[in-house]
Amino acid sequence: MIAPGPTLETARLILRPTALEDLDGFATLAGDPESARFIGGVQPRAMAWRAMSAMAGSWALQGFAMFSLLEKSTGRWVGRVGPWMPEGWPGTEVGWGLLRDAWGKGYATEAATAAIDWAFDHLGWTRVIHCIAPENTPSAEVARRLGSKLLGPVKLPPPYDTIAIEAWGQSREEWRARRK
């Protein structure tokens, strides 16, 4: 079963709503110390289930959530990318979290580009942010490649309120001007 929502495609990737079959991927992402370092830290499979369920629930309640990210060539789940704005979040975010073996391939930038286009065109967002830990230089580089600028420190809601986070972002107009 797949949560309600659209499927997006890029040259190499499929972005679709969360499906029950994604649990192994979510658990691998949550269980790897490097992959999970900046997305809440290592979590057991039961917490990966909760995170996956939160994504599916957000699709049902808000009409958006991070997409499950699949390689087109293999159909393999490689991460989650897309719009995210839970209660108390500092803004309309497009975020990403990829399995370690999917790093360095340009997937985060490619998928986030499709997700930002969708958020601006279909959700009517006027601004997008990316919440990034200052020491997460690879994600800061993705934000730069997307055309976002460092906006400054932001506070996330509990239980993440003790983590130093910086917002990167841009307006819909800035995004569209850059995409022409």
Residue ranges and their predicted role:
Residues 1-38, 53, 66-180:
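Acyl-donor (CoA/ACP) binding surface of acyl/acetyltransferases
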Residues 44-63:
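Active-site rim helix/loop that mediates acceptor-substrate recognition in acyltransferases
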